[in-house]
């Protein structure tokens, strides 16, 4: 838990994930990039001062740290996946976490419904890209393949945070309307 509460560690995971490969598990190679969106709304959703929303977000985010410079929020591309940035963020996180007594590698339990081939393939893709970018000596994604009932009970139907005995779960949500 301590590692996931560290901003630099979360940013390392963010830059380590190959979203195109992850999407290809469901949408195929040709359709993989077509579904990619870095923001919840289209980057052209609204404008202010003659600039699209995506451009405004890029500018504001780049001002928060060098790691965000060069990140584009245009649709149909993955400008977040960057192994060099992932490693740089991990180096910062590792120093901070080791000073708190955290041991490496960090093991992250990731729950997935084993009855869904697509979800299992996506979980394996996530595991592969994160471990390849950051190194298994630093981060290991432990994919927990559960039955549908067990996965639902551990995630969707858990009554309290204490009942959620995992580190990561990927679900989907998007706005119903663009306004």
Give each language-model segment a name.
Residues 1:
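Periplasmic-binding protein-like
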């Amino acid at each position: 838990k301590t590692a996931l509460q560290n901003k630099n560690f979360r940013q390392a995971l963010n830059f380590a994930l190959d979203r195109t490969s992850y999407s290809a598990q469901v949408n195929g190679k040709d359709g993989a990039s077509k579904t990619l969106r870095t923001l919840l709304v289209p980057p052209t959703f609204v404008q202010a001062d003659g600039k699209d929303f995506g451009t405004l977000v890029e500018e504001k985010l780049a001002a928060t740290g060098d790691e965000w410079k060069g990140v584009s929020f245009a649709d149909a591309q993955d400008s977040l996946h960057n192994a060099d940035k992932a490693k740089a963020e991990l180096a910062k996180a590792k120093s901070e976490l080791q000073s708190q007594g955290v041991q490496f590698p960090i093991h992250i339990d990731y729950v997935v419904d084993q009855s869904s081939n697509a979800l299992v393939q996506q979980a394996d893709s996530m595991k592969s890209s994160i471990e390849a970018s950051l190194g298994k000596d630093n981060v290991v994604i432990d994919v927990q393949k559960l039955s549908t009932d067990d996965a639902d009970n551990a995630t969707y139907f858990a009554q309290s945070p204490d009942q959620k005995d995992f580190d990561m779960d990927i679900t989907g949500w998007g706005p119903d309307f663009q306004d």
